[in-house]
Every structure is written in structure tokens, then in C-alpha cells.
Curated annotation (Swiss-Prot):
GO-annotated biological processes: cell adhesion
Family statement drawn from the similarity comment of this UniProt entry: Belongs to the N-Me-Phe pilin family.
NCBIfam families: IV_pilin_GFxxxE
Originating gene: fimA
Subunit organization: The pili are polar flexible filaments of about 5.4 nanometers diameter and 2.5 micrometers average length; they consist of only a single polypeptide chain arranged in a helical configuration of five subunits per turn in the assembled pilus.
Membrane topology term: Single-pass membrane protein
Transmembrane segments: 8-28
Swiss-Prot/TrEMBL keywords: Disulfide bond, Fimbrium, Membrane, Methylation, Transmembrane, Transmembrane helix
PROSITE patterns: PROKAR_NTER_METHYL
Protein name according to UniProt: Type IV major fimbrial protein FimA
Pfam families the record matches: N_methyl, Pilin
Cellular component, GO, one term: pilus
Residues with the N-methylphenylalanine modification: F8
Summary of the function given for this chain in its UniProt record: Major component of the type IV fimbriae that plays an essential role in twitching motility, natural transformation, and protease secretion.
Length: 161
């Protein structure tokens, strides 16, 4: 009488587990990088929100305006997001007139100081992204950035010569 084989052998199961382990070895670091990049992108959104404040302050010849005061309705020079804190920094340089020149105003984003607390990726916690505002109003990566290049959003990445 023939016996029918049912199920998988131990060797077959071990091979499947090994394949899953190899796939996970590649997938988990890639996923962690993806999470860090998406969290770092929030900083550029915060900086975009500060553009209006910078434009208002530039009418007074300065990058930074008065500090926040809820009593008087002054919104201040910083914006806190889920993963980071963006602050307006720098000194306005009125001599710059070309659209691609930095105007002296900067936005400094510090990751890990947002409302999410410990839910931020360890790959970007405590890192800074400094954005220089150009005369045309756009932002580009500035000096003082210590965020790894692979996490900097392409929209503001410094152009390599």
C-alpha cells in the first residue's frame, strides 16, 4: 500500500525561512530609509509655511520678526511640526538682486523637536537641515546641514558642480 506524503519536509521549511530572512535583510533597512526620508520631507513643508512670514518681515528689512506673542496675535519666527521644528534665522542682504542668489534669510529645521517625540526615525533625530532662501523666494540646502544627503528632499538639495 502506498502512503501519501502530506505537508512539507523540514528541509523545505528551512529553505523557505532562509529565503524570507534574506529578503528581510534587504527590505528592513530600505524601509527605515524610506520612513526617514518621508519624515525629513516634513521640514521642507514647514519651511514653505514660513515663506509668508519671511516675506512680511522683509518689508521691514529683516528676516526675523518679533517673537511669538499670542496676546497681540504675533505668530513668531518658528513653526513646530510632527517631526521637527523650523526657525527663521539669518540677516537680510539687500545687495543681492539675482533670482538665484541667497538673500541672507535661512530656515533651520531641527528634527526630533516636533510633537511626535520619540516616534521619529533614529536616522534623523537631532539632525539639522538648513535652507537658504533665494531672492526668488525658493529654498536651497545651505551650509550647516548635518542631515545625511540621502534624506534631504530633492526639491532643496544643493546642486553639485
Amino acid at each position: 500500500m502506498k502512503s501519501l506524503q502530506k505537508g512539507f519536509t523540514l528541509i523545505e521549511l528551512m529553505i523557505v525561512v532562509a529565503i524570507i530572512g534574506i529578503l528581510a535583510a534587504f527590505a528592513i533597512p530600505a524601509y527605515n530609509d524610506y520612513i526617514a526620508r518621508s519624515q525629513a520631507a516634513e521640514g521642507v513643508s514647514l519651511a514653505d509655511g514660513l515663506k509668508v512670514r519671511i516675506a512680511e518681515n522683509l518689508q521691514d528689512g529683516e528676516c526675523k520678526g518679533p517673537d511669538a506673542d499670542p496676546q497681540s496675535g504675533v505668530v513668531g519666527n518658528e513653526d513646530k511640526g510632527k517631526y521637527g521644528l523650523a526657525k527663521i534665522e539669518g540677516d537680510y542682504d539687500a545687495s543681492k538682486t539675482e533670482a538665484g542668489d541667497p538673500n541672507g534669510c535661512k530656515v533651520e529645521i531641527t528634527y526630533g523637536q516636533g510633537t511626535a517625540g520619540d516616534k521619529i526615525s533614529k536616522l534623523i533625530t537631532g539632525k539639522k537641515l538648513v535652507l537658504d532662501q533665494l531672492v526668488n523666494g525658493s529654498f536651497v540646502q545651505g551650509d550647516g546641514t548635518d542631515l545625511a544627503d540621502k534624506f534631504i528632499p530633492n526639491a532643496v538639495k544643493a546642486k553639485k558642480p
